[in-house]
Regions:
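Conserved catalytic-core segment of nucleotide-activated headgroup transferases in glycan assembly
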Residues: 11-38, 147-316, 320-337, 459-463, ...
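C-terminal "capping" alpha-helix adjacent to the active site of nucleotide-linked donor transferases
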Residues: 154-155, 386-406, 412, 754-774
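Active-site donor-binding acidic/aromatic loop of nucleotide-activated sugar
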Residues: 319-329, 335, 506, 690-703
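A donor-sugar binding/catalytic signature common to diverse glycosyltransferases
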Residues: 341, 348-368, 596, 702-748
């Protein structure tokens, strides 16, 4: 770098600001420290905020698997910043990331569509990336470095400096970004006086009642419910209790090691839930060799890891004295200093075969011989380790100190040459030179004519038919999705990607989307839900930006009871609900709009029908649902604030009594995937009959199950007033709407459950031929009354891209 040339600044996006995470140290902190010696500056961050791109010349995302990473990569490409993704695990191995919030492979594939280059620590992993990702994507190999005490301290200091800067964030910024403040301002804008008073009273109760409970010495009625295990990241679900310092030297089983025992050291992650054998289990694979060595020599097996229970189950029963030490970087160094031989077994499955030589190099540089399974990463060290038979290798080192000395002498020079800080800096400089000199170009950005915006889980079923129509007609179409949607409903990432349309994930702020520049090709933008309400701010901000850019904008009626169109209450007063989209595509005749809908809104409305597919793919129900028995679905609404306690009690009591009265029928209560009133907000006690199941979306067995996917399994549907009534009616199912004391003329002629007896009457009618047919006929009549027949998706696409169409989608 010349004296006049501006120093490079690299932004390192990490999974967390935690120097204890191996990938953070080896793949980011050690490289940035090496590059700093070469005049390259760096900043590290774990946030996906676009602000982090300011002032950097390249973005390196290090083994991070979130929707924010996709959004940040897109934003960087748009700004002309090269995106390099550094990956040290084979995320495409079977069951990798099992239990993770979002499938890592899905995230990596999306970033691979636009990344400038990928970097891996081994050739094996590089080949996997070339096979799995887009053709022509450059993949480079930068090996793991060698961890030393001073290097680890410098890495920890780098993280601490970053955290300290975050702690100095001004108080005014924290107040400005407060979710409670934002919700209150929204309520003032859209609620009635009665609605505002009710919400404030509820807020005050939830804040003050726990305080009162503590003063009175009783349990709080609004104590927060513990997070379900299925919602916790895998690392939290499968984490052993750390050993106390006094426990670190315990020999669990077998005869205690003698004071003069030679120490055989293994250290690393205990394992994972993905396919293959990985972690401590690798020692068990070499059980015969270890036990034979223990019979012939005075040895101790020392395991430094992060799962004491797994050690007790797998390692302690082996016929060799053994000791468990809870993992930390400092304890690894302590045990390494005392070791005689380091063991690096490898199962050589699809995941493990791609691992680097970092443990082997660390041991050799510390002056300890290594016995290892031969893997491609260890080929350069083949003449200074024992690779192969573990019994022979361990025996040689225990009996031949000259061999140990010779191997260590070769290894230290070799490791410094291959994995030292100078080597790491050189490898990274080559990558940075390539991506910055335009030898490599970022993937061509998509040039769509139509942009579809997805923000909530229910948006997916609207978008897929629209994508299909656009693609059939040769119209370039793209999907812009929110990071919050993918974080909250991870399966939506794969569902949208499967539509075949290019997917862009957008970052968000408290005020909405971080809207990128619209490509010149864009002629129209369609949101599924666009109002001035908080849940729609992401879509609404994109609509506003498109309007300013002179692009045609549209939005959809997204529910049968749609705020601002067909529904009003004290929190969502219809006169205060506004739509910024120029066109609003509604399902039925305009006479079905709410009588108080504003004239401004009415003039934007165009009747097209419902674009959601009536027939949907049949989902697989969990094994907990008995086979061979009829199933009835009971659906809760997204907006449970609309109902009083009397209605809620009527709904829950009725469902429970119904299940007791019909023991041969399985009833599945399906909470709304976005609302989840019964599973996350209900404060009462639930005592349910065995044949009444709750399809909790937070549980792995129910995750991703939508109402549409359930319908093909059902004999009938009972629902609170909601779109599910229409969805079920469209596929010809008998439907009952739980009315209680609500006036629901808009659901005529569907069956209304207004009394306790009506619950049982409806269920009995489901299995009586004559009465069932009457219910099916009522469903058909309901659909005919509220939905315009025909291809709604085609009409919407035509309206958006052809301004010469009249209100019915026909050429003027």
């Amino acid at each position: 770098m010349s004296a006049d040339e501006k120093p490079l600044v690299i932004g390192w996006k990490l999974s967390s600001l935690n120097a204890k995470v191996a990938s953070v140290r080896y793949r980011a902190l050690f490289p940035l420290l090496a590059l700093r010696e070469q005049g390259v500056s760096s900043k590290v961050f774990a946030s996906g905020s676009v602000r982090n791109l300011t002032g950097i010349d390249a973005l390196v995302i290090v083994k991070s698997f979130t929707a924010d990473d996709i959004a940040l990569a897109h934003a960087a490409v748009e700004k002309g910043i090269p995106v390099i993704y550094d990956l040290c695990d084979n995320v495409f191995a079977e069951r990798y990331g099992y239990g993770s919030v979002t499938a890592p492979a899905d995230i990596v594939r999306q970033i691979g569509m636009i990344a400038t280059a990928f970097v891996t620590p081994t050739d094996v992993l590089a080949d996997v990336m070339r096979d799995q990702l887009r053709d022509g994507l450059p993949v480079y190999v930068v090996p793991d470095g060698i961890e030393t005490g001073p290097l680890a301290e410098a890495a920890a200091a780098e993280i601490e400096q970053t955290l300290e800067a975050a702690r100095r964030r001004p108080l005014i910024e924290r107040i400005r970004d407060s979710q409670d403040v934002r919700k209150f301002l929204e309520l003032l804008r859209t609620g009635s006086v009665r609605g505002i008073a009710h919400r404030l009273a509820k807020y005050a109760y939830r804040k003050l009642e726990p305080v009162r409970a503590r003063i009175l010495g009783r349990a709080s009625r609004v104590a927060p419910r513990p997070m379900a295990p299925a919602l916790l990241p895998r690392s939290q679900n499968d984490r052993s209790t750390p050993q106390a310092a006094s426990d670190l030297g315990v020999t669990f089983e077998g005869k205690p090691a003698s004071p003069d025992a030679r120490r055989l050291l293994w250290y690393g992650n205990h394992g994972a839930l993905h396919g293959g054998r990985f972690g401590m289990i690798d020692l068990v694979d070499n059980r015969a060799a270890l036990e034979r060595i223990a019979r012939e020599f005075d040895v101790e097996l020392v395991v430094v890891s992060n799962h004491a229970k797994k050690f007790e189950q797998l390692i302690a029963p082996l016929a060799i004295p053994s000791r468990y030490v809870e993992w930390s970087p400092a304890r690894v160094q302590e045990e390494l200093a005392r070791a005689d031989i380091v063991l690096v077994p490898n199962s050589c499955d699809a995941f493990s075969l791609g691992k680097s030589a970092n443990r082997t190099a660390l041991a050799l540089m510390a002056g300890h011989p290594v016995v290892a399974t031969p893997t491609p990463a260890l080929v350069p060290l083949g003449d200074c380790i024992e690779a192969g038979d573990f019994y022979i290798g361990i025996r040689r080192y225990l009996t031949d100190p000259q061999r140990v000395a010779a191997h260590i002498a070769i290894a230290r020079e070799r490791c410094e040459q291959l994995y030292g800080q100078a080597a790491i800096a050189g490898a990274w400089l080559s990558v940075l030179d390539a991506v910055r000199s335009h030898v490599l170009g970022a993937a061509q950005l998509v040039q769509p004519e139509l942009v579809l915006v997805a923000n909530l889980v229910q948006d997916v079923e609207f978008i897929r038919p629209l994508v299909a129509v656009a693609r059939e007609r040769g119209i370039p179409v793209a999907i812009w999705a929110s990071t919050s949607m993918i974080c909250r409903w991870p399966y939506t990432l794969a569902a949208l990607a499967e539509s075949g349309a290019p997917l862009r994930v957008l970052a968000e702020t408290k005020s909405g989307a971080v809207v990128p520049r619209f490509p010149h090709s864009v002629r129209a933008v369609l949101t599924v839900a666009d109002t001035n309400l908080g849940p729609h701010r992401f879509s609404n901000s994109i609509t506003q930006a498109a309007n300013k850019a002179g692009i045609v904008t549209g939005t959809l009626q997204h529910g049968f009871e749609n705020v601002g169109l067909t529904y009003s209450d004290d929190l969502h007063v219809i006169e205060r609900i506004e739509f910024d989209a120029r066109r609003i595509f509604v399902w039925g005749n305009l006479s079905l709009l709410h009588p108080r809908v504003s004239e401004k809104t009415r003039l934007k409305c165009i009747s097209v029908g419902c674009p959601k597919a009536a027939e949907t793919a049949e989902a697989v129900l969990p094994s907990i649902v008995p086979a061979g028995k009829p199933v009835v679905g009971i659906f809760e609404n997204l907006h449970w604030h609309r109902y009083d306690d009397a209605y809620r009690s009527f709904f829950l009591d009725g469902a429970s009594r119904l299940a007791v009265a019909h023991p041969d029928v399985t009833f599945i209560v399906k909470p709304h995937n976005a609302g989840r009133w019964l599973t996350t907000r209900f404060d009462g006690e639930l005592s349910l009959p065995a044949n009444l199941l709750i399809a909790d979306p937070s549980e792995a067995q129910w995750e991703g199950l939508t109402a549409a996917g359930m319908l093909p399994h059902l004999s009938g549907v009972i629902t609170s007033p909601s779109t599910v009534a229409l969805d079920a009616a469209r596929v010809g199912l008998p439907v009952a709407v739980v009315a209680h004391d609500l006036k629901l003329d808009n659901y005529a002629p569907l069956y209304l459950i207004q009394s306790t007896a009506h619950w049982n009457d409806f269920a009995t009618s489901l299995f009586d031929g004559t009465h069932r047919q009457a219910l099916v006929d009522a469903s058909a009549a309901f659909v005919a009354r509220v939905v315009l027949p025909g291809d709604a998706a085609a009409r919407i696409v035509e309206h958006l891209l052809n301004p010469d169409l009249d209100a019915q989608g026909l050429a003027a």
